[in-house]
């Protein structure tokens, strides 16, 4: 407690150095935290899937054009994939420019046509109502429900769907805490109609022990697009299975589906660049923090020298420096999160993703508060702990002009 009071008293007395150091570190941390949150979101896409490393999308290759498609098992020949190997299989149809209407208005929506197995592979939390139980049932996202019904209870409300049929809202689903590759507003059953305007895509989970290498070898065998019309249609295709976690990083496959508003993708090169920028910002902030801290403590060389003459232990000195840096980092973190909160709307628009607070934010802040004070305390501790008392006292007798000059140099230093 005495060390904490002493550290706080020093920071209050050195107001100019404290404020400059606090603001510099806060801006650096705010930028780094924003970037790390974005990188974390990109690396955890579709983690709501039951096992994104072992749920596979079907990638079809036809005349060099590769995209997401389905498994065709119409002919049970030597290259047929036995259904016994498939544990779960879901077929989806993406209706990007779709609409629903009520008595007053018409609403543009992104419709996901799905079967019941989709929610077994990609669980969503139902915050109100029940899952789809009939062909005429539909699920809405919370955002879509507010857009259409406002604050009214949407459960049981009837909407007129684009195919001419009426659908009843049976439930409201919450947005997952993670980013998802498939974006939608409304989910309807694939049994609502026997004919849809778009081709489906499929996701598959194989039974335990199934060799994905063997499945891909079967998929490499060329198949006829129209086996009964080979003389007229000479097109052939192959397919392969790719984990959900990898499809997101393949823009060509996602863009081939032709639904840019419903299928998102990422680029690894962007993650590498942003990671380097984040690291450079953090290093710049740490170096400037240490330099300014040393300027602020330069006058205390006499104090440290006298304490060493009276036998102060290195542990006590390190604890004192660590406490001061811990207080500064803690205050800088609070200010950084305030800056993040103020800028969250423009940043979300820039990065095209609405950020929400998750447990990652807590652990990130806790990690910074624990690790950063230790890193920034090592060099000042080594400088003063291993210097002779006479050297520390002599350094403290330098004129105030030197200290002020160093301060002006650091303050006027251009932003990196």
Write out the residue ranges for each language-model feature.
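N-terminal membrane-entry
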Residues: 264-279, 364
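Alpha-helical transmembrane segments of integral membrane proteins
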Residues: 1-22, 260-263, 293-319, 323, ...
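Mid-to-C-terminal secondary-structure elements
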Residues: 115-127, 138-265
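Hydrophobic alpha-helical transmembrane segments that constitute the membrane-spanning cores
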Residues: 27-31, 35-36, 327-345
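Structured, solvent-exposed hinge/loop segments at the ends of secondary-structure elements
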Residues: 32-152, 161-168, 217, 416
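Short, solvent-exposed beta-strand edge segments and adjacent coil->beta transition regions
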Residues: 55, 199-202, 301
């Amino acid at each position: 407690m005495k060390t904490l009071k002493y550290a706080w008293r020093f920071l209050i007395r050195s107001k100019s150095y404290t404020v400059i150091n606090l603001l510099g570190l806060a801006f650096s941390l705010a930028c780094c935290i924003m970037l790390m949150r974005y990188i974390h979101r990109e690396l955890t896409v579709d983690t709501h899937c039951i096992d994104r490393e072992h749920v596979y999308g079907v990638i079809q290759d036809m005349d060099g054009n590769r995209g997401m498609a389905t498994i065709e098992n119409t002919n049970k020949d030597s290259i047929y994939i036995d259904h016994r190997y498939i544990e779960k299989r879901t077929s989806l149809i993406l209706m990007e420019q779709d609409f629903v209407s009520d008595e007053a208005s018409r609403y543009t929506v992104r419709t996901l046509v799905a079967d019941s197995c989709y929610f077994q592979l990609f669980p969503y939390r139902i915050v109100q109502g029940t899952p789809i139980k009939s062909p005429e049932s539909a699920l809405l996202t919370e955002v879509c429900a507010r857009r259409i019904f406002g604050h009214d209870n949407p459960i049981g409300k009837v909407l007129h769907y684009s195919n001419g049929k009426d659908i009843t809202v049976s439930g409201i689903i919450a947005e997952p805490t993670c980013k998802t590759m498939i974006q939608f507003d409304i989910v309807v059953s694939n049994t609502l109609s026997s004919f849809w305007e778009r081709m489906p895509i499929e996701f598959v989970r194989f039974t335990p022990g199934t060799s994905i290498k063997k499945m891909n070898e079967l998929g490499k065998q060329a198949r006829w697009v129209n086996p009964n019309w080979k003389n007229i249609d000479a097109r052939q295709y192959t397919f392969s299975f790719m984990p959900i976690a990898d499809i997101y990083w393949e823009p060509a496959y996602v863009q081939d589906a032709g639904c840019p508003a419903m299928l998102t993708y990422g680029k690894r090169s962007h993650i590498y660049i942003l990671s380097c920028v984040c690291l450079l910002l953090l290093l710049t902030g740490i170096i400037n923090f240490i330099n300014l801290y040393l300027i602020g403590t330069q006058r205390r060389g006499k104090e440290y020298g006298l304490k060493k003459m009276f036998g102060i232990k290195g542990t006590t000195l390190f604890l004192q420096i660590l406490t001061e840096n811990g207080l500064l980092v803690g205050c800088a973190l609070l200010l950084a999160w305030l800056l993040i909160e103020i800028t969250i709307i423009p940043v979300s628009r820039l990065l095209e993703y609405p950020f929400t607070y998750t447990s990652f934010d807590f652990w990130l802040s806790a990690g910074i508060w624990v690790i950063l004070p230790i890193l920034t305390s090592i060099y000042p501790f080594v400088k003063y702990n291993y210097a002779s008392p006479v050297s520390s006292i002599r350094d403290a007798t330098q004129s105030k002009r030197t200290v002020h000059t160093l301060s002006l140099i650091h303050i006027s230093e251009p932003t990196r």
